[in-house]
Every structure is written in structure tokens, then in C-alpha cells.
């Protein structure tokens, strides 16, 4: 078995990296990449990249750790970051959550930046319902219901039970594939 002390140390390191290093307080968001030399923000495609799906996935992991460690303040902080992230990542024109965003609003390097992916929405729904379950925050439940409606209206195949994985910005099926390199049993 793994030494409990190693597990404890790993949890501490991961919490610090996510909540104190990659989370940028002035932005209220988690960034994907920082300078390797000093953990500062970098003005490049990679340095400006925000992936709302990764951030929301990380926040429900953090909520789980907060519960495991008996740290309600950690849960509350994760919920606040999750709410800020989903509000930032939500497409106000067509609905759904963008795949990638640029923290300065510049053009994206990723051509798929405005696609709506199933896993981003599922991870977001988990974060929202978990946030509601652990804190009773009504905003989390409201977002969960909004996500639930969007997912079942857009990702569901009306003929066969498996969801489509990739939608265009307008929420229309982009690829009729139901499985692939990224769409499998993990997501």
C-alpha cells in the first residue's frame, strides 16, 4: 500500500499548485500554463489559455478533498471558483461552455476553441451539483439545471442512447461519432 504520509504530502502539493499557483486571484480563474521559471503569467497562446472544463473538473476534485479533509473553507473556495469559471466560460449568445478561451480575449490558437464538448458539460454539471450538495448554494443548483437542460437538448441522440460528443458553437452536432480518442469511459 501507499504510505499515508506520501498521500498526505501529495494532496498538500496538489492543493497548493491548483489553488495557489494556477489559480490567479486577480483573474478569479485557473490558467492552463505559467512561466516555468517563476510561475508568472505569460503573454502567449499557451500562457493566455483558459480551459473551463479542466478548471471545473479540478474544482469538484477539490470539493471532494475538502470533504475528506474536513475543510469546509476549501469547499467554499472551490465553489466560488467554479461559479466564477462557469459564468466566464458560458457562451452568452448560443449557450453551452466554450472549450478554450483566451484570458485577454485575443484570437485562439486552437481552432476548436468555440466547440461544445460533452465532457466539459458533464464535468461542469458534477461540479455544480456537488457544490450544491456540499454548501446548499442555490447558484450551483441553478447552473446544474441550466447545464442539464442544455446537455439533454443538444448532446442527446434522439434515436440511439449514446450522446454525441462534439457540437459546434450553435449547439449543433459537429461530428456524429459517438466514441473516439477522447470520448470513452473516463469522460
Residues covered by each model-derived region:
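Glycan-recognition and catalytic cores of secretory/periplasmic carbohydrate-active enzymes
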Residues: 1-187
Amino acid at each position: 500500500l501507499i504510505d499515508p504520509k506520501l498521500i498526505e504530502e501529495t494532496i498538500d502539493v496538489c492543493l497548493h499548485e491548483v489553488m495557489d499557483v494556477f489559480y490567479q486571484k486577480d483573474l478569479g480563474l485557473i490558467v492552463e500554463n505559467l512561466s516555468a521559471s517563476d510561475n508568472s503569467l505569460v503573454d502567449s497562446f499557451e500562457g493566455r489559455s483558459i480551459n473551463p472544463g479542466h478548471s471545473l473538473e479540478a474544482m469538484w476534485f477539490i470539493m471532494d478533498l475538502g470533504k475528506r479533509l474536513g475543510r469546509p473553507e476549501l469547499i467554499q473556495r472551490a465553489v466560488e471558483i467554479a461559479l466564477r469559471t462557469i459564468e466566464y466560460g458560458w457562451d452568452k449568445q448560443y449557450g453551452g461552455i466554450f472549450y478554450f478561451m483566451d484570458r485577454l480575449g485575443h484570437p485562439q490558437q486552437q481552432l476548436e476553441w468555440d466547440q461544445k464538448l460533452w465532457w466539459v458539460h458533464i464535468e461542469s454539471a458534477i461540479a455544480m451539483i456537488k457544490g450544491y450538495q456540499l454548501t446548499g448554494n442555490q447558484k450551483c443548483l441553478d447552473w446544474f439545471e441550466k447545464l442539464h437542460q442544455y446537455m439533454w437538448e443538444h448532446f442527446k441522440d434522439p434515436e440511439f442512447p449514446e450522446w454525441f460528443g462534439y457540437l459546434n458553437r450553435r449547439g449543433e452536432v459537429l461530428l456524429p461519432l459517438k466514441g473516439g480518442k477522447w470520448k470513452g469511459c473516463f469522460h
